[in-house]
């Protein structure tokens, strides 16, 4: 009997110990998932960490503006710069202890990150009403396979930048008239040009390709180098390339800054150098030029926005929701435009008097109506090589457009197949 009684007591003791252990484990889990609620209830501030690899000054503008806007919600953001951001996210995208809550980067990396399964949809946090003031093109840029993973903040595109002291008369309204002006005002032997552009760089020829309804690659990862409209576009662009000779990035910039070219097709990143060169410059949108088919030039647009790491949704959903709503605001857009000279994703920001007076920003706003977001699918990374080889073959080596298109279409298809 004593033995049976001892067994009964031992059983009770073990069961009690096991139950206590289970309660401790459940309590620990509740403490983790409820950390945000606990922080709010005790008045502690919840910090949302955002990794970036961009301009520290721009991040400072965003950080200051957001933190002022959500100060009464016990939430703040903190930017941390990480060189080689996509590689860092590959390493830490599933590491809650060492990774960020969010990241800010160019939208064209989205497909790769989404395929890794590390991102949470923006729509898990905010509604379409919250994003109602955002330019549709920028929202499209942050969408991959019908799911929005990136909230857009600002964007950029190619522009038509001209020297007001050299340009003769009014700017043309059609690309045909622009071509005529170039023929009349270009002297290759003397080294003076009307307009310079990187004609063997796919990004710089994309405005013509897109405007002709051609494409470099579509959303289904099908290369479009041999598409009939792409071929027409490259044939048409060749007329402009023939008036230039070599036109790499440095050559084009030097020609314009040394006032040997009246105009250049380039992005907002050129403006500081142009100012330093003392040039009296003007800017207009590429969308202001109409192609022979009646459509506007349609450059690619690069959009900078924020994405959310999936594990952060579990622990900081309320805090991140507050941050995203603040980032959607007109105040952020106005601050980015005024303090950083960025074209904001928020449409209401352009109603600000000072923003509306900014020629470069308003030119990009016009461009946003026809611009196409740069493809954000992973396969785009292997398309630049074949596309630019095709353009170089046509514009530098004088090869037949259709033959080159066929050759480099096959090369592109092989490169994509190798990614599988």
Spans of features found by a protein language model:
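Extracytoplasmic/periplasmic substrate-binding proteins
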Residues: 67, 235-316
């Amino acid at each position: 009997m004593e033995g049976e009684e001892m067994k009964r007591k031992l059983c009770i003791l073990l069961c009690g110990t096991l139950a206590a252990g289970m309660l401790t484990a459940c309590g620990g889990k509740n403490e983790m998932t409820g950390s945000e609620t606990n922080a709010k209830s005790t008045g502690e501030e919840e910090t949302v960490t955002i990794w970036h690899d961009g301009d520290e000054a721009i991040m400072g503008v965003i950080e200051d503006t957001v933190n002022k806007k959500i100060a009464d919600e016990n939430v703040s953001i903190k930017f941390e710069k990480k060189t080689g951001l996509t590689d860092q996210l590959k390493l830490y995208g599933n590491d809650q202890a060492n990774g960020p809550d969010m990241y800010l980067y160019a939208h064209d990396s989205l497909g790769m990150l989404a395929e890794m399964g590390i991102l949470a949809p923006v729509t898990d946090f905010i509604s379409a009403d919250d994003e109602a003031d955002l330019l549709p093109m920028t929202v499209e840029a942050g969408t991959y396979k019908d799911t929005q993973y990136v909230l857009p903040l600002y964007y950029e595109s190619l522009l038509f930048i001209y020297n007001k002291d050299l340009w003769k008369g009014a700017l043309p309204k059609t690309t045909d008239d622009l071509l005529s002006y170039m023929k009349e005002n270009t002297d290759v032997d003397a080294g003076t040009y009307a307009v310079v552009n990187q004609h063997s760089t796919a990004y710089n020829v994309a405005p013509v390709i897109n405007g002709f309804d051609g494409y470099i690659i579509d959303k289904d990862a099908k290369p479009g180098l041999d598409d009939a409209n792409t071929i027409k576009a490259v044939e048409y662009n060749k007329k402009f390339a023939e008036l230039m000779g070599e036109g790499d990035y440095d050559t084009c910039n030097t020609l314009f800054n040394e006032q040997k070219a009246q105009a250049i097709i380039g992005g907002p990143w050129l403006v500081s150098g142009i100012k330093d060169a003392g040039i009296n410059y003007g800017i207009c949108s590429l969308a202001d030029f109409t192609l022979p088919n009646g459509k506007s030039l349609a450059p690619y647009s690069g959009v900078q926005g924020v994405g959310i790491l999936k594990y952060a949704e579990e622990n900081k959903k309320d805090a991140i929701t507050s941050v995203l709503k603040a980032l959607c605001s007109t105040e952020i857009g106005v601050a980015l435009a005024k303090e950083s000279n960025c074209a904001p994703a928020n449409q209401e920001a352009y109603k600000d008097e000072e923003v509306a007076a900014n020629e470069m920003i308003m030119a990009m706003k016009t461009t946003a109506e026809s611009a196409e977001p740069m493809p954000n699918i992973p396969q785009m990374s292997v398309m630049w090589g074949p596309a630019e080889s095709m353009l170089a073959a046509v514009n530098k080596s004088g090869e037949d457009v259709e033959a080159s298109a066929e050759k480099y279409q096959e090369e592109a298809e092989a490169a994509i197949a190798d990614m599988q």
